[in-house]
Every structure is written in C-alpha cells, then in structure tokens.
C-alpha cells in the first residue's frame, strides 16, 4: 500500500511539473557568467512565438535589455531577478521601437529604473503614441555599469529603421535583438517597418565591428547558435529571389 501511495504521489508531482513547464510564461536561461536570457511569449500569426531579452548582473545592479513582450510579465521578471540574484534592475535599454522591446518602458520608469532608447526610437514611439523611455542616447554609446562595459551600436536599418545591437567587447557577447534572425527562423518575420535592401549591409557591418562573438542573442526563437548572422544573410538572399 505504501508503494502504491508513493507511486501515486510521484505521478502527481510529474504531472504538476509538466503542467507548470507547458504553461510557463516567463523563462530565464543562463548564458555565461553574469549573463542571462529571459523569454516571454505572445501570439504571432496564430502561433505562439517566443521573444528573447537579456540581462546582466553587475555589482551595482541589473541591466536589462528590452522589456517583456507579454505585458503580464513586467513585474514577474523583476521579482524573478531579485529572488535569483538579490539585486534590483537599475537600467533598461530598448533596442528598437516595436512592442516586443518597448512595451514595459512606462511600467519600469515608475519603479525608478533608468530607461533608455536612441533618439530615433524615441521619435518613432512618440509619433505612434507608444511607451517612451526616460532618457535618449546617441546610436553609438558606451555604458559602464559596475564591472561591465558595453556599447550600443547602430549598424544601419534592417528589421526596423532604428534597430541597434548591444556589444560586450571583452566578453564577446552580441545582443542582436530582432535585427538578427535565429537559425530556427524560416523567414524574415515582421517586415512592416523593414528595409530589406539595407539589411544585408547592416549585418555585414556588424560582422566587421563585433568580431568573433562567443554568444549571439537573437530577438526570437533559439539563441544558442553563433551562426545566426550568416543565417540572417541567407534568409535575406532567399527573400530577394522571390
């Protein structure tokens, strides 16, 4: 009887664990060292689509790159980071004007988090009456927070006219956002604001400037491959042939 009861309880635990995993709306994965990718989800063209953001834990606090796409996860992300690292988010930088990057800017400003976008992104958000950051920066800027330094780099138009990437030159970590397509991607995705003529040139500029990245974090889908820049160029070539 005891064995049957134990088996039953184990079965319940497995089912509960599976349900939590399949219903998970926020996922945090370790990249390396103090770097983490967080993933939220939304529906796109009738299918569930992941959106990747990143954060780095510094001596002074946590720096967040982009905000959750799922608006219900603004606070859970802050809570999860604090529980895991015992540090608060102090800076948030959005990499372009679409809602999967900027949706949480107004929310995070209320908590005293310093929010940043480029001036171009700010102008687009203002014109569209969408959330704006507290501060604007030049497209190519250098930040030092705690023990980490990183660059915001505008290589040119692509997914949007304002998309920037984040480059950690010492750690060789490239946060590409939606400008760089995952190796899982079979097409270029949302082209509403895209410039497909400039996009390949932009990617090549990134390859020349951000050399030999150890990690490339894409805006959506799988981010674990270092071949995503080449894959983006391949998708652009295929698009031109249509």
Segments the model singles out, each with a brief description of its role:
Residues 34, 56, 66, 81, ...:
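Divalent metal-coordination and catalytic microenvironments
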Residues 226-242:
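Short, electropositive alpha-helical surface patch
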Residues 1-22:
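Bacterial Sec-dependent N-terminal signal peptides
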Residues 22-26, 30-31, 61-62, 69-70, 119-158, 160-227, ...:
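Metallo-beta-lactamase
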Residues 59-61, 72-116:
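Active-site metal-binding motif and surrounding structural segment of the metallo-beta-lactamase
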Residues 30-77, 165-178:
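Conserved beta-strand hairpin/beta-sheet module of binuclear metal-dependent hydrolase folds
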Residues 37-39, 55, 63-65, 90-94, ...:
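Structural recognition of the beta-strand scaffold that forms the well-ordered cores
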